[in-house]
Each structure stands twice: as structure tokens, then as C-alpha cells.
Design a protein with these regions (language model features):
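DPxDG-like acidic metal-binding loop motif
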Residues: 72-113
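Non-transmembrane, aqueous-exposed alpha-helical and coiled segments at domain scale
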Residues: 253-254, 314
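Glycine-rich flavin
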Residues: 1-77
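Glycine-rich phosphate/cofactor-binding loops in nucleotide/flavin-utilizing enzymes
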Residues: 266-314
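Glycine-rich phosphate/pyrophosphate-binding beta-alpha loops
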Residues: 74-79, 161-168, 285-288
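C-terminal helix-coil-helix/basic helical segment that borders enzyme active sites and/or dimer interfaces
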Residues: 217-248, 258-269
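Short, structured patches in soluble enzyme cores that scaffold and shape functional sites
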Residues: 43-45, 62, 73, 88-91, ...
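Glycine-rich beta->alpha junctions and the first turn(s) of the following alpha-helix
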Residues: 122-216
């Protein structure tokens, strides 16, 4: 709802396009509020599209009264459970047109539409509850009015509202907090499911908790600052801070989980307690496209040293 709601309201559209967007998103919102519909957002395809460097290979070819969608999404969270798949695809007027990022379309594909299939298993290191199986679109007809954003507006959003790609960070900020909270309760002997034994009196435990608290507060500080700056047309400094916040949250969540396991000791890694899951889930955060940890580092280094349009050609 962020992309089709507040974010879309900040972007440029002519009056006709904006009115149509208001009408179509009202349909989606009514489904969610009145019918309890679940919308998923399949994104990755196994190539460079999710990183924002090429057009999505999933296509939506214009047809009478709608589009015909063809393609595949991997790591499709809620595959088989969602009612609609908010699918990023490339709109084409004809099947042989050259795909362009500027023609990206954000389309709600009904899960029960003919040609939608869910295949494969889901047995990863972490994020097991997302059930992110592979989603296939085989000549799927999607009617007009299914747009979540008007054609081309996603491309504008990616260029002008880059904080839109930080929407996974709250979950990992929560994991970071959970790792710290687990440690405090465990050392105080107050954790449900663990022996009521206090371990807080040991200096090594106190120092470890202090280190964890410092890392948690530093991570929160940059994250809240970046979130407060989310909006259209951010400055270069704000974009660099967004990359830094994304990197810090995703990496520090796992670092805190590691410290929690080391500090609490062997019992804390039992599957009957939450810390084992927090550790596995948090390790996956730095892999999340389009702003993986590696991409954030690459962009921070380059954009700090180069102004737009600069190069080293003689």
C-alpha cells in the first residue's frame, strides 16, 4: 500500500492518469479491507532486473481489455497463499517489442487466474515461513484495472523515491531488537522456556550486553534518520545515508544474533527457543534485492567519489 498510496501521491502524473490510479487502487484497498485479500509482491527473477539495471523479463503484452503476462518469479514470498501477486513486469505493446525499464508495470495478477502456477520446494537457511517458491505465469490474462501503479510510474518512483527499496528493513530492525531482548531476558533468568537461572552477575556477560546495546542504538539511530528523510527527490547525502542504513540494519541484525548466541551460551541455540530462528532469518537480510549489502557498499563508495556524470576519461 505504500507504493500505490503515499509514494504514488508524491509522483508526477497528469490528471487523467492520477484519477484512474485513484479508482484502481480503491478496488485493491476494498479487497484488502472488506474481503481480507492478501497481496504478495514477487520481485526476483534470477537476473539483474531486481537490482534495477535491466528490464524485467516477465512481460505484460497489451491485449484486448488487458494484458497477457508471461514469465517467472523466484523467491516469491506467499506463493500459493496470496490472493493476488503484485508483479513487476515490462509492458509491451507487441510481443516482439524491445523491453525497457521505463515501461515497468506493477500489476496485480489474480492467484486463481488460468496459467498461474507455483512450483518447486522451499527449504532455505532462513525465512522459512515466507514459503517463497517459484511462480510461473503462462499466458495469464489480466484485465484492465488491475494496475497497482500506472504504466511507467514505477520507473519514476525508483529514480525519484529510492527509499521505497528500504521496506524490508523494519523486519530486520525488529530481529536486531529481538536478539538483544532475548539476551537480556535470558541473562536475567526471565525467558519463557529457559531455566530460571540468573547469569547477569558475570562481568563478561555485562560487557557483551553493553556492546550489543551500543550496536543496537547505533543501528536504530541511522535507520530512524534515514526513514525520516524518505520522500521524493532526496539529496545525494540522503541517498548515501539510505544505503548506509540499509547495510547497517541487515548486517548488524545478524551480528547481534551472533553475539546473543555467544553470550547466552549453548542452551540458546536450541530450536525450542527463538534465537536460533532469529540468527538464521537475520543472515538472509543482506541478500535482499535490490539493495543487497554488496550493492550498498558499491554504491556508497562510487557515489561518494563521483558526482553525477563524472568519469575518469582523459
Amino acid at each position: 500500500c505504500l507504493w500505490s498510496g503515499a509514494l504514488a501521491d508524491d509522483l508526477e502524473m497528469d490528471g487523467v492518469v492520477r484519477q484512474r490510479h485513484h479508482d484502481t487502487r480503491a478496488v485493491h484497498y476494498r479487497r484488502i479491507l472488506d474481503d481480507g485479500a492478501i497481496y504478495a509482491q514477487p520481485f526476483s527473477e534470477g537476473g539483474s532486473a531486481a537490482a534495477g539495471t535491466v528490464a524485467f523479463s516477465t512481460t505484460a503484452v497489451r491485449s484486448d481489455g488487458g494484458w497477457v503476462v508471461r514469465g517467472k518469479k523466484i523467491f516469491a514470498s506467499l506463493a500459493g497463499s496470496a490472493d493476488y501477486y503484485g508483479t513487476l513486469c515490462t509492458e509491451l505493446q507487441h510481443a516482439d517489442d524491445k523491453p525497457s525499464r521505463s515501461n515497468t508495470l506493477y500489476l496485480a495478477v489474480p492467484a486463481k487466474a488460468e496459467g498461474v502456477r507455483v512450483v518447486g520446494d522451499w527449504d532455505p537457511l532462513g525465512m522459512r515461513a515466507t514459503v517463497s517458491r517459484t511462480l510461473l505465469f503462462e499466458e495469464v490474462f489480466v484485465p484492465d484495472g488491475s494496475e497497482l501503479l500506472p504504466p511507467g510510474v514505477y520507473f519514476q518512483a525508483a529514480s525519484r523515491w529510492p527509499h521505497m527499496f528500504m521496506t524490508l528493513t523494519p523486519a530486520y530492525m525488529g530481529l536486531a531488537q529481538a536478539a538483544y531482548d532475548f539476551t537480556v531476558k535470558y541473562l536475567r533468568g526471565e525467558l519463557p522456556g529457559a531455566p530460571p537461572v540468573k547469569r547477569r552477575m558475570y562481568p563478561t556477560k555485562q560487557l557483551a550486553v553493553a556492546d550489543m546495546r551500543l550496536m543496537l542504538e547505533q543501528t536504530k539511530a541511522i535507520w530512524f534518520q534515514a526513514m525520516s528523510e524518505a520522500g521524493p527527490n532526496p539529496t545525494k547525502e540522503q541517498i548515501l545515508r539510505a544505503y548506509a542504513a540499509q547495510y547497517s540494519v541487515m548486517e548488524n541484525a545478524n551480528e547481534l544474533a551472533q553475539l546473543a548466541i555467544r553470550t547466552c551460551g549453548g542452551l540458546s541455540m536450541l530450536k525450542s527457543l527463538a534465537l536460533e530462528r532469529i540468527y538464521r532469518d537475520s543472515r538472509c537480510g543482506s541478500l535482499m534485492l535490490p539493495w543487497t549489502a554488496e550493492i550498498c557498499l558499491d554504491r556508497i563508495g562510487r557515489e561518494a567519489l563521483y558526482e553525477s556524470g563524472e568519469n575518469d576519461d582523459a
